[in-house]
Amino acid sequence: MSAAPDWNPATLTQRVFEILRDEILDVSEGFTPQSNLVDAGLDSLAVTQLMLSIEESTGIWVDESLLTPENLETTATLALCVHSQLD
């Protein structure tokens, strides 16, 4: 078995971005970690799918109370929220 990845804000941002881009959203080439997620099509169903994918991919569970508009604004803000659950 390999060791768990060292999840830091940068690696989490990249992983969350990949999940959003490849599994959750139908996005254009211009989609970046700083793109607004609601503008990119994130809705409540997509949030549920996203959080399940993040937990499955990283092993990090995020409390629903942290899924605020501020934390779901961009990939980067969401990754920081996920990272906060490691403390």
List the model feature ranges, each with a label:
Residues 2-29, 80-87:
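Thiotemplate assembly-line natural product biosynthesis machinery
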Residues 67, 72-85:
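C-terminal structural segments of small proteins and small subunits
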Residues 22-40, 59-66:
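Phosphopantetheine carrier-protein modules
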Residues 1-2, 67:
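STAS-like cytosolic regulatory interaction modules
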Residues 44:
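Catalytic nucleophile serine of serine hydrolases
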Residues 48-71:
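Phosphopantetheinylated carrier protein domains
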